[in-house]
Amino acid sequence: MILPLLLSASSLSVPFVSQHKDTCGAAALAMVLRYWSEDVTQEDVARALVRPELHGIAGSQLAEFARSRGLEAVAYRGDMAQLRDFVGKGRPLIVAWHLGGTRYHDVAVIGFDDERRAVLVNDPAAGPSRAVKAATFEKRWAGAGYWTLLVTRKGPP
């Protein structure tokens, strides 16, 4: 369940990018790269990485693209405590959701709303700063094996 847009949420200022067809990964990565002041569009990412047979982009390719831009990128099996820690340190993440059947979707995690028990995401399909109930977020994320991508600048924060 997606809750109404939050106007005063505790979240990172991650620029929002609305996705084109089958480009949620490209849009999510473009958001995070723009957060790190990289001049990149989802079209740049998609041109380099979209695989029509996957109806999108493989997660490993997102990490490779970020590294090709000089950033550090690590894909791993995450947990909620790690998400909170990284976001609390000013580092947005990309996670994959399983939406049912063979449908997967990438979103950028930008904050948390403890009062509403929600995770704040920039969802390239649904809009910026969306509050998703933590239980719904966790179920979708678990379905995708808790796949998480951390992209940061090299060196100390």
Regions found by a protein language model. Name each.
Residues 25-33, 42-46, 59-66, 80, ...:
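Extracytoplasmic/secreted envelope proteins and their assembly/folding machinery
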Residues 57, 102-106, 129-130:
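Extracytoplasmic/secreted cell-surface and envelope-processing proteins
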Residues 2, 88, 92, 112-157:
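Noncatalytic regulatory segments and standalone regulatory/sensor domains
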Residues 28, 32-37, 49, 53, ...:
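Sec/Tat-exported extracytoplasmic proteins
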Residues 9-10, 22, 26, 39, ...:
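Residue-level signal for well-ordered alpha-helical segments
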Residues 1-55, 80, 99-101, 115, ...:
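Active-site-adjacent structural segments surrounding the nucleophilic cysteine of cysteine proteases
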Residues 67, 72-123:
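Active-site-adjacent substructure of cysteine-protease-like catalytic cores
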